[in-house]
Amino acid sequence: MGENEDEKQAQASQVFENFVQATTCKGTLQAFNILTCLLDLDPLDHRNFYSQLKSKVNTWKAKALWHKLDKRGSHKEYKRGKACSNTKCLIVGGGPCGLRTAIELAYLGAKVVVVEKRDTFSRNNVLHLWPFTIHDLRGLGAKKFYGKFCAGSIDHISIRQLQLILFKVALMLGVEVHVNVEFVRVLEPPEDQENQKVGWRAEFLPADHALSDFEFDVIIGADGHRNTLEGFRRKEFRGKLAIAITANFINRNSTAEAKVEEISGVAFIFNQKFFQDLKEETGIDLENIVYYKDSTHYFVMTAKKQSLLDKGVILNDYIDTEMLLCSENVNQDNLLSYAREAADFATNYQLPSLDFAINHNGQPDVAMFDFTSMYASENAALMRERQAHQLLVALVGDSLLEPFWPMGTGCARGFLAAFDTAWMVKSWDQGTPPLEVLAERESLYRLLPQTTPENINKNFEQYTLDPATRYPNLNLHCVRPHQVKHLYITKEMDRFPLERWGSVRRSVSLSRRESDIRPNKLLTWCQQQTKGYQHVRVTDLTTSWRSGLALCAIIHSFRPELINFDSLNEDDAVENNQLAFDVAKREFGILPVTTGKEMASTQEPDKLSMVMYLSKFYELFRGTPLRPMDSWRKNYGENADFGLGKTFIQNNYLNLTLPRKRTPRVDTQTEENDMNKRRRQGFNHLEELPSFSSRSLGSSQEYAKESGSQNKVKHMANQLLAKFEENTRNPSVVKQDCRRVSGIGKPVLCSASRPPGTSCCPKLEESTPRLPPPLKRQFSSTVATGQVLRELNQVPASGECPSRPWRARAKSDLQLGGVENLATLPRTCQGALALSGVLRRLQQVEEKVLQKRAQNLANREFHTKNIKEKAAHLASMFGHGDLPQDKLLSKRVPHAHPPSPPSCLPSPHPAAASSPPAADSVSPARKVVALNHRLPPPLHLTVGKVSSGIGAAAEVLVNLYLNDHRPKTQATSPDLESPRKAFPLSLGGRDTCYFCKKRVYMIERLSAEGHFFHQECFRCSVCSATLRLAAYAFDCDEGKFYCKPHFVHCKTSSKQRKRRAELNQQREEEGTWQEQEAPRRDVPTESSCAVAAISTPEGSPPDEPISPKKPKSVPEPNPRDVEAEATSPRPSEWTSVRISPGEDTVRQDVLAVRVLVTSEDSSSDTESDYGSITAPCAGAYEERPQLPESPPLSKPLTRHISLRENLTQPVSLLHEEPQALPALQRAHSLQSPTPSKYQNWRRRFQSNSTPMNQRAPSPPKEPPPPPSLSSSSSLPSSFSSASVPGHTADDSSSPQVTYNLHSPQISRGDVSPTPIYLRRARAQGIVKEIPLYLPHSPMLESTEDCLVEPGRESLRSPEEISSSEGCQEARALGNTRSIQHPILGKDQYLPNQNLALGAAGNPGDPREESRMGQPGGPELSKERKLGLKKLVLTEEQKNKLLDWSDCTQEHKTGEQLSQESAENIRGGSLKPTCSSTLSQAVKEKLLSQKKALGGMRTPAVKAPQEREVPPPKSPLKLIANAILRSLLHNSEAGKKTSPKPESKTLPRGQPHARSFSLRKLGSSKDGDQQSPGRHMAKKASAFFSLASPTSKVAQASDLSLPNSILRSRSLPSRPSKMFFSTTPHSKVEDVPTLLEKVSLQDATHSPKTGASHISSLGLKDKSFESFLQECKQRKDIGDFFNSPKEEGPPGNRVPSLEKLVQPVGSTSMGQVAHPSSTGQDARKLEGGEGGSSLVSSLVLVSDPVAPVTEATSSPTSSSAEEEADSQLSLRIKEKILRRRRKLEKQSAKQEELKRLHKAQAIQRQLEEVEERQRTLAIQGVKLEKVLRGEAADSGTQDEAQLLQEWFKLVLEKNKLMRYESELLIMAQELELEDHQSRLEQKLRQKMLKDEGQKDENDLKEEQEIFEEMMQVIEQRNKLVDSLEEQRVKERTQDQHFENFVLSRGCQLSRT
């Protein structure tokens, strides 16, 4: 008997083993049935089955399985299987989710029945598993059933294997599984319950199945179908047509197959090149592809329909997807070929054979299906009750929420839903009320679509059935029971149709501001906004808008700084409309619906177009109150940032703080208090003007100034008021826009233009700052003498009304320059200033409103002010400014000087000089130059106390008159008014699609580059890929649009050759012209300066800004110079490729890539979207040509550090330039949070460029601006030309690059490296010409170039050399286009350039000469000379610096290096000007400054040695090389420079001094200036630590750092954002010299540097000291990354990007070396002063490499045991390192998958948005036809109702476009993150190679990878900053809106 028992036991064990190892569904069932028969078990006894089975099968394998299952079943929620012992459940579908639900219910003790209509598990398709899913399945014993389950780093499994695992577990737990049974429907309980109490049953096929009598309480749909269970309404998420192909190939598990890497996913968003290569090679066009290796080689891809048609896979094209993919319409053979080709290409043809696996039908396992639409149930569960029987109905799996397959969420979310459903069943079984059960389930279901691996709990061990263990921050009551009443169904079952939903998320601001207004409300709103504007009478939505003034008025009413309404000419409808369209597009992202020309050409604009266009304004500004000063400060803080939004208005505060309340306040006491309050608060960045803070001067008051009595004042006020009232009725009067500053009461100059009889006569308006607000924007003029001068000093370019937008000046200023203007100027002035004209105009002012205002104003004003004082102001104002006076004014103030024509660029003084706003066309600027040649310098007249600034202001008045009252001025162009595109006349109308030439209706219309088209027609001309408004390229010459990867095809080679010839000719002419003009310069010839020097020509007035990048030899252009332009290529002919943000109002379309290739017939097509950044310096961006940009710069104010340094330096030149102080004070007060952000870009843009030996500047297109303060007066004429005679280049291989010198406003900091795709294009050999435009920045020269290190004789940054060094990066592409990266929109134009103007001076002035003798003057001059030479290095010199193996040679001093640079400039003749030009005293000062820096220069630097150098590399490469060179100190060269490589202890010595001096600089009295840098560093640190794509487990390896690596922390590496703000008193170092000094030094020369640098990394753990000894002994670079795991700081396993790429903080130089080797002080320093070093990132970039080459034991040890222990220790460390490397690899893969899934989600969302837009377009077209009378039933419907529907459609479209732009921003950030991660991994692999085996190519590759990675890091940084700014702005706007609503007594309900 015992033997039989043993036999039976052995048999059972074998059968159980067969059951566990079964590989099919049938085999599993068969083995299970045999097992139950053998062991006499009853499967229907679900309560005892598992326990009995466990007791009878006790093999060791089975026991391991029982242990796991018991551990799961021990959870308290199951109550030992008794929680739901009375519940019967039916689960429809035996898929993974159905079986997982069954298992949970079985654990709860329920009776569970699963019906599956098939008896085979044949799905080879692979599921991606989340970490918690893997953990959960392992807990169920998955590894016992399938040994390969998630082995290693595998995170996927085939559906078939997963089903088998769960199937077996379910059977063992007592679940009944019935196969070949199909569920049909639920049967209700019969009505006759008396005879038989039958509950809920189901109908099955076959009908006679035993389950037909099974009664159940719970039914769960898990079959993946959408309508298996009735009662669930569904939402449809439709994208564009998506056709998926799955293919399974036989996996023979060969070695070759094992080597093929899986493809976790290739997303089209950031892998476009892969798909384009695939298409070019095979003709297969995919959107994504995934390859998983399981039991088969599984491929899944999304194919494009056109590709399938072209390849013959689909025979015929049908609109209906079902017909399209039906078997009759698919060629199976072509489908197999298609899948095989795609798989071959994706695996790089490495799979030896691709034989298809066979599916359950015996056919090749290839399938094609449609997932265009995805569905989700609105509810997860419902309750039915019939005849007192309740039925709980639930959904899980795909039936509940269909996944988007590329995201890999299906299985994980299905399991979560299974757990939630089981929890619901448990709650219901325990007696919880049904409504509460449903409410809790719905609360959980709302979380399900949002779950990701990141936002669920990470402690998987604690996961139970309780949702609180899985979801953090869980709210089980977010849905209340009363909200789910409709889910408790007691009546007949309802059938719910499918409901189509858009998946577009709705932001709070959108939903709460939902509009339901009708067009008549829109009209009313427009009337309210335009009320009070002259010539604006809005009576309808059509004709009232034709002149364009109404549109401009709406914009002006909300953003007055954007448009100067006074300068608009009512007759110029084209310009007015185009201005409004351009400003709205640029600032608000509102796309134009037509062009200015079309608008003016039609008698009545299209009503629907206007409704659509105006609705966008309504949606944007609705609810925005007219903001008085108090509310503004209340909402935005006392120190309000008035630059909220994209235009950072630093000084144009006048336009933002105007009182707008229309109801005057009479409470004088309150107003006085408000005035005092505001006067106390003031503006932090402006001086108080107490003398006229409450004074207002009117011309008519001046007329009565003799009267001092208050009664007479009142009388005059009344008399004046009566005249005012009549004045406004005259339609010919241009609206007065002179206004005072609310809250400060500063008078401003009148900017309104008037007819000849008009004088600038302000109304009696303000006597206190808190005035009754005027009628909207009809403000009085306020004029003063000294106060006005002070105002001019404070507001740059305020030679005209500060309230007038800065960009509006170019038009008026330049119009004045014509010959006819000069002829009529005296008469104009007389007419404009005639007092009689004033009185006549005063009689035409509007009556009622102004009466109260004037009375109040007069009372307040004349109570407190002296009439004589006012009269003096008025007389002074109008008696000066080159304007002849007559009548009363001439009597009072004699005008002794003849009128002088104003300068083309009027500004009161260099500090306030602001260049005129530039248009994007260059041709108007040429006209300006020509006019300026004929204008003599303005005579600066003085009358009384008024300085020359008033003269410029008075000139503005004449300009305004000429502009506004001359019908059309030919001397100017509308392009100068605003950066807009004058579209070619050949364009089609707005109703014709640019591509298909068919009718395009309003709702479906998109516009770009002045073209209008259908959304579906907007495709790339090369690949026909769908384009988006936020990412495209456009060729103006060819009129074609391109996608990003194909924009390089924009120009043909013939055009390149033509332009090359033109540019060559131009360069020759320029060189000749410069040689001729050079002798005219009054500059010492011995100075060595390059093109970057700045100076003022003899004939140039001091108030004209001088471009810092103009050649010194360029004098003021004259007509002869202008003639030379005719022979040189016109700027409009230069091809400029622009990648710019499309409608990037709030950075929405940040990814816009528009490549404009300008031509002669489209001369103004740069249509800048970046304008109006900073009002005072907006002009600095208007006229600038497009620059090569990678990601534009996002932070507005960044160059103030140098200004602040100048202010604090006792030897600063600023003290000799009193006029510059106001601007400098403003700069000091408006400190940038990212002080030196742009210096990095100035380094970066030169990274991949050719030498500067092939450039020649074009003739300047306008007079040079005034020089910067730091410019030297002793600059040589011999180096004025940008062309270097001694250098030649191969023009055929590298075309010349010519720069346009006409724009003095361009900041060099704006130039950034080309995007990645640009470099790719360059790598492919695409050579095109790029006439790069010079960045001209007074800021750069006046402020930043002052940043010289006291111990250096050369500039610190290589970019400060010359104008020709400005844009090297884009030149590498070879096309005559400038590239602007799309990331940051218009903020790439630095909005702070005006600050530099404050430091401008006239070098020709004797004061400049005297300044040069002062301390600092010669030094600055010297530094300038050196800096201007230093990067004109020969190729040999540059290569020498970049040669990684060149560490053997001694380092030169900065002087010698500069001498060599000078030699290169001269073409080979060495002239040591550096040392010879400095006096002995200056040298001594420099020497003392060197000592003050204490060790900045190492001894090795001071050993001069001449040497030959190889060809050049870019400065960025130079920096990167130096960094890497410092890492490779164990190389041959490193050994030569390391006399004591065997040193076992960290040397001590000299760096003490350096550390101290650097820290002293950081902690000096100017240390507070570094706080913005620290802030930025922390911000970057936070970002990188959060968004790092790097490995999460490698941080410990960052601790074993070589001394030289850490020492290189002091490098001014390009990505270190805050580098230039580090030493406030330091001078800019020459980069080659700096690298020679800092990078190439050895640890023996800087004894303590290693420890201090390691400590400076900010490692928070003291354990780093324990492995310093090991660090110093390691020779191989690999050793430095081999720090064992236990040696790293505990828990420091996340090498975030903070360590990898964090920019050096604002005190990075101070952080370089700290005297303490303990690290505590250094950590404190790092924590307080910003992030860790960027250079240290290289440590983390490198993967820990293999074995440590040297034993770390003491070399003095001679014991064999010790050696053995050492070897053992090494082996252990190697093992640990291998383990760590494996973890890092897994982490990197997880990060990659995370990015992939995000990308797939974004891609899907974009498709859904596109589809939703298409649907809206269809509806809108139908509606539009009806409204236009084109439909048959047009006259039968109410127009008001139709317009209301139309309005709703328009609003919906606006939301969709906004959401689309947000998605594109996310996509761009994801692309950068992915690219960075790939580069990092690539660099890790490169650095694993032993140093001895590396050749030049290897080192070069490492260097290039490092450079590219640094560039990507910068781009991400800029993008994050941009997004942060946008978020801040949105939050502020929301808060402002909420405050407004709450102030109205309303309540906000967020939805």
UniProtKB/Swiss-Prot annotation:
Motif Nuclear localization signal positions after renumbering to this chain: 660-681
Q: Which positions does UniProt annotate for Zn(2+) 2 binding? A: 1020, 1023, 1043, 1046
Write the Enzyme Commission number(s) for this entry: 1.14.13.225
**Primary gene name:** Mical2
Q: What sections of the protein cross the membrane?
A: none
Q: Indicate the quaternary assembly.
A: Interacts with PLXNA4. Interacts with RAB1B. Interacts with MAPK1/ERK2. Interacts with RAB1B, RAB35, RAB8A, RAB10, RAB13 and RAB15 (in their GTP-bound forms); binding to RAB1B and RAB35 is of low affinity compared to other Rab proteins; binding to RAB1B and RAB35 is of low affinity compared to other Rab proteins; at least in case of RAB8A may bind 2 molecules of RAB8A simultaneously through a high and a low affinity binding site, respectively.
GO biological process entries: actin filament depolymerization; cytoskeleton organization; heart development; heart looping; positive regulation of transcription by RNA polymerase II; sulfur oxidation
Q: Which CDD domains match?
A: CH_MICAL2, LIM_Mical
Tell me the protein family, please: Belongs to the Mical family.
- Where does tissue-level expression of this protein occur? Expressed only in testis (at protein level).
Name the UniProt key words of this record, in alphabetical order: Actin-binding, Cytoplasm, FAD, Flavoprotein, LIM domain, Metal-binding, Monooxygenase, NADP, Nucleus, Oxidoreductase, Phosphoprotein, Zinc
Domain of life where this protein originates: Eukaryota
> Where in or outside the cell is it found?
Cytoplasm; Nucleus
**Which annotated residues bind FAD?**
97, 116-118, 123-125, 183, 298, 398
Outline the extent of the LIM zinc-binding domain.
991-1053
Q: What is this protein called?
A: [F-actin]-monooxygenase MICAL2
Residue stretches making up the Calponin-homology (CH) domain = 516-619
Question: Which reaction equations make up its catalytic activity?
Answer: L-methionyl-[F-actin] + NADPH + O2 + H(+) = L-methionyl-(R)-S-oxide-[F-actin] + NADP(+) + H2O
Q: Bias regions of kind Low complexity — which residues?
A: 691-700, 910-921, 1269-1285, 1599-1616, 1749-1759
Record's domain comment? Answer: The C-terminal RAB-binding domain (RBD)(1796-1945), also described as bivalent Mical/EHBP Rab binding (bMERB) domain, mediates binding to predominantly Rab8, Rab10, Rab10, Rab13 and Rab15 (in their GTP-bound forms).
Which residues participate in Zn(2+) 1 binding? 993, 996, 1014, 1017
A Pfam family: LIM
**Region Interaction with MAPK1, annotated ranges:** 1314-1353
Q: Where is the composition biased (Polar residues)?
A: 1129-1138, 1228-1239, 1246-1256, 1291-1306, 1706-1720
- In its UniProt entry, the species of origin is given as Mus musculus
Q: What class of enzyme is it?
A: oxidoreductase
